[in-house]
Amino acid sequence: MIIGMFFYGENDFKAKDAMPILDESVSSSYERKDATNVETAVSEAIKEHGKTYGKREYITEGHVILDTEQKGNKVKAYTIASVGVFEFQDGIFTIVSGSGAIPTVMTFSIDEHGQYKLIAYEEPLDGEAYVESIKKMFPKKYDSKVLYAEEYYDELAKQQERQAQEYLKNIGRHAKVSISYVEKQPLNISVQAMNHFLRMLSSDPFLNECPDWLGTREVIEQGIRYVYETSQSKANDGRDVVTLRKMKEDGTVIDMRQYVIEENKLKRIK
């Protein structure tokens, strides 16, 4: 039985740059390190897997290694792992996607240079199959740990927070780091108009980058940081106006759209 298994044929972890590397395909970055020990290999594998959580600025991870087994040049690591993906929202470097504490088994091969290569990344199945799949993945002696993996989450979240803080230090940015949801200011429009707005966001590449709240989010595109802003004002006739902007860090406007609320729909006026 295959249990939430991901196979990686050519995924070796070698030293790159001292600064975080931007992955152009998914616009998420993390600091890659030379994986010549299982601790680093596990960390890198979780962050690589974190790319599946979507386009964001920086990937962090937290993990606890319960045990390892080695047979020949193969190493299996029994872990509890968590992914945390961050971006700037309203000036706060906040977690926007990721996972809880997930019992995870990783298998690596070790090449002639001592580099670890990820072969398989196993997570338990969801729903009713969750417990049974964990029992198939882990030795029975770890049942008391992996069946209550959520008890490790605070520890894993602290690891993610430290990595996020280190990333900000590396890019020379001073900002608050939040590992929990940050309350947003919603648009002051009707439910029907908001639903129409959300449908628009999902169908337009520019709008899709804009916040669905009154505020800002930052996106790195081809190595350049842009600020997307959603704001609301009143027209001279009293109608609500929603303005969406894409700006450089210095405030230079690259793109802008304005919509007026009419009959619970957004009508473009600029």
What residue spans do the PLM features occupy?
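Low-complexity, intrinsically disordered terminal/linker segments enriched in charged
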Residues: 119-202, 264-265, 269-270
